[in-house]
């Protein structure tokens, strides 16, 4: 089995080393194509306005000056010699990719790009108690459980238009309680903040920050599982259509385009 590895934390990230150790439990036919620089939060961004440069580290390991999506596309169309991969693994991300964060995640995007090429793709993330708290990161949890989970997923299979999003809880392996197949959750509080700073010349600048807030996610969600020490396995697909709203709106917007009648209309609550 040929496996392509990528990530969004960059070619030197410790999580990529963990991913390689997971992959080599499954196969010795491994290709690694990862960003030269960190691309956390890049989502499905493409490099369109600059050339994409590639550094070959060894015959099957490349660093790409681009996003995770660029990396997978480059691997598929320019870098991998011989047969296409049978599997794309993206990660292991430094921090969880849960709930609405999956739309921001370069790790998830790498898996989506693999799926777009018709390859079975899995995103893997290691949750942390605090953002980028690598001192106490439990990489051993992902490495301990990752091979078995990937193997079982391959045995079970999943639809071609679906990726699998795996999140390991921020605990040591012996503290993991079980694996749960979950749905994508949604946080009940906003956790990002834009923090204002001032440089030595008196000019303002801003950092994106994260605020730890109490949360009570719904049962059956990826959030709840990881918060309670379980490994979350979530099938995701790229179709973002909300079918219930489609059905509800058809009566109001179907047919002849509506005409603007008067200003100041109140919106529906």
Swiss-Prot record:
It is an enzyme of class 3 (hydrolase). Pfam families: SurE (PF01975). Binds 1 divalent metal cation per subunit. One of its GO terms (molecular function) is metal ion binding. Its main location: cytoplasm. Its cofactor is a divalent metal cation. It catalyses: a ribonucleoside 5'-phosphate + H2O = a ribonucleoside + phosphate. This is 5'-nucleotidase SurE. It comes from Caulobacter sp. (strain K31). The gene is surE.
């Amino acid at each position: 089995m040929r496996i392509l590895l990528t990530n969004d934390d960059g070619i030197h990230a410790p999580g990529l080393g963990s991913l390689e150790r997971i992959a080599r439990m499954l196969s010795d036919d491994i290709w690694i194509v990862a960003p030269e620089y960190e691309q956390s939060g890049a989502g499905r961004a493409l490099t369109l306005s600059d050339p994409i440069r590639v550094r070959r580290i060894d015959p099957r390991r490349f660093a790409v000056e681009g996003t995770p999506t660029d990396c997978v596309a480059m691997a598929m169309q320019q870098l991998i010699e011989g047969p296409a991969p049978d599997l794309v693994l993206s990660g292991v991300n430094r921090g969880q990719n849960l709930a609405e964060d999956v739309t921001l995640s370069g790790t998830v995007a790498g898996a989506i790009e693999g799926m777009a090429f018709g390859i079975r793709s899995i995103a893997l993330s290691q949750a942390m108690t605090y953002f980028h708290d690598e001192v106490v990161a439990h990489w051993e949890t992902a490495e301990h459980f990752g091979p078995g989970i990937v193997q079982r997923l391959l045995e079970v299979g999943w639809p071609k238009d679906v990726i699998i999003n795996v999140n390991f809880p921020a605990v040591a392996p012996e503290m993991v309680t079980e694996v749960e197949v979950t749905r994508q959750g949604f946080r009940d509080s906003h956790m990002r903040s834009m923090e204002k700073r001032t440089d030595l010349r008196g000019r303002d600048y801003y950092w994106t920050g994260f605020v730890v807030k109490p949360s009570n996610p719904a049962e059956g969600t990826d959030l709840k599982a990881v918060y309670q020490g379980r490994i979350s396995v979530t099938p995701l697909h790229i179709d973002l259509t909300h079918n219930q709203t489609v059905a509800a709106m058809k009566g109001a917007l179907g047919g002849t385009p509506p005409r603007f009648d008067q200003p100041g209309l109140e919106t529906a609550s």
